[in-house]
Each structure stands twice: as C-alpha cells, then as structure tokens.
C-alpha cells in the first residue's frame, strides 16, 4: 500500500509539472504572436481588505523583447521607459529622473515578465491555465510578488493582468484599444529634461 502511495505521488508530481510546463509554453507562445503594440490602460490598487487605494490611467507602447514606454497620465504624470539598456523613471512633479540598468530588473516584476517574455523568467513560476486566464505563482517566496494573473487571448492580445504582493495588496491593470503593429522608435528613447535631478544608479 505504501509503495502504491509513493508511486501515485510520484505520478501526480510528474503530471502537475507537465501541466505547469504546458501552460507556460502556451502563455509564452501567445505573447510571442504580438511583438509590438500600443494600448490605453486603467489601474486599480486595492488593499488586503479590498479597499481602493489608488486608481489611475495611462498609455503603453511596447516592442519585445526589451523596449517599452509606460506612461501614467492620472492621477499624477510619470513615465517608465526602457531603451533596451537603460530603465528610465521620470516624475515631472518632483522633477527627478532615475536611471538603472535594465539587465538588473528582476524577473519577478510582472511588467518585465510581459516585456521580456523570456523562458528563463517563466521557469521561475508554476503556471496554471484556465482558458485565456493564466495564474503564476513564484517557486521562490523570497520576492515581494505573491501571485501574478494575466488574461491573454489566443491571438496575443493582453486584456488585463493583476499582481498580488505578499502583504495582500493587489494592482490590476486593464488594457483597452490595443493596436498591434509598428511602434515609432521615438517612444523608446529618453533624454532627461534640463533642470531635473538625475539619480544615476548605473554604477
């Protein structure tokens, strides 16, 4: 009996690993169908008890594997831009720019996952799939991300994604009006405006 239980557990483990791998492969394949797009987004952040913490809107331009421009227009304006090497964060209100190396961006950051769509990043997660919904749980609990959920259609259109942090805070992003096609390269370049403070962490 014990031997049968051991074999059953082993089979279950192998099956579940295969299911995770298939789901991750399907997710990566869907995302690969669209290499560049522009979309509008709305953001809603809720606390552990479900209370609204913040809501916002903005625009997103993306070109895989490493180019993006995430521009928040409300409630406050800001921009997170990757030119392929440097990750720029610009906050006009405080007149400050932060520059870091994109390669140092962690793979447990949801947006970096979507942008890079790299197998080595997805391998760090157990991925479950139900139709167009994918649920990712980090294999390591060392990071701040507890769970990541994303809805992607079979043609590669991202409808929404949600990041849940270890403390229960949840950030949901809904994408609308996604337009697939060539994106102007100017969207992925950034030069700090004169007069702003530059916090250059690329040392």
Swiss-Prot record:
Among its keywords, does the record have Protein transport?
A: yes
Give the subcellular location: Periplasm
For this UniProt record, the keywords arranged alphabetically read as follows: Chaperone, Periplasm, Protein transport, Signal, Transport
GO CC annotations on file: outer membrane-bounded periplasmic space
Q: Name where it mostly resides.
A: periplasm
Q: Which InterPro entries match?
A: LolA/LolB/LppX, OM_lipoprot_carrier_LolA-like, OM_lipoprot_carrier_LolA_Pbac
**Keyword Aminoacyl-tRNA synthetase appears in the UniProt entry:** no
Q: Name one GO biological process term.
A: lipoprotein localization to outer membrane
Report the leader peptide range: 1-21
Q: Which residues form a coiled coil?
A: none
Pfam families referenced in this protein's UniProt entry, alphabetically: LolA (PF03548)
Q: Family assignment?
A: Belongs to the LolA family.
Question: What quaternary arrangement does the UniProt entry report?
Answer: Monomer.
Under the heading PANTHER family, the entry gives:
OUTER-MEMBRANE LIPOPROTEIN CARRIER PROTEIN
Known function: Participates in the translocation of lipoproteins from the inner membrane to the outer membrane. Only forms a complex with a lipoprotein if the residue after the N-terminal Cys is not an aspartate (The Asp acts as a targeting signal to indicate that the lipoprotein should stay in the inner membrane).
- Please report the name of this protein according to its UniProt entry: Outer-membrane lipoprotein carrier protein
Native source species: Pectobacterium atrosepticum (strain SCRI 1043 / ATCC BAA-672)
Lineage, highest ranks first = Bacteria, Pseudomonadati, Pseudomonadota, Gammaproteobacteria, Enterobacterales
What gene name does this entry carry? lolA
């Amino acid at each position: 009996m014990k031997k049968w239980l051991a074999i059953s557990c082993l089979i279950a483990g192998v099956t579940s690993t295969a299911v995770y791998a298939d789901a991750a492969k399907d997710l990566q394949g869907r995302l690969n169908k669209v290499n560049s797009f522009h979309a509008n987004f709305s953001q809603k952040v809720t606390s552990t008890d479900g209370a609204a913490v913040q809501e916002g809107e903005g625009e997103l331009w993306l070109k895989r594997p490493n180019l993006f421009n995430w521009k928040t227009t409300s409630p406050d304006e800001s921009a997170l831009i990757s030119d392929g090497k440097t990750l720029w964060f610009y906050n006009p209100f405080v007149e400050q720019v932060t520059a870091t190396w994109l390669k140092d961006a962690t793979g447990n950051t949801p947006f970096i996952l979507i942008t890079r769509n790299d197998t080595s990043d997805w391998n760090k997660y157990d991925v479950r799939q139900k139709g167009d919904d994918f649920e990712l749980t980090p294999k390591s609990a060392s990071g701040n991300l507890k769970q990541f959920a994303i809805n992607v259609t079979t043609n590669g259109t991202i409808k929404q994604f949600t990041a849940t942090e270890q403390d229960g805070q949840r950030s949901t992003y809904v994408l609308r009006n996604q337009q697939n096609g060539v994106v102007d390269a100017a969207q992925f370049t950034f030069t700090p405006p004169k007069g702003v403070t530059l916090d250059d962490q690329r040392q």
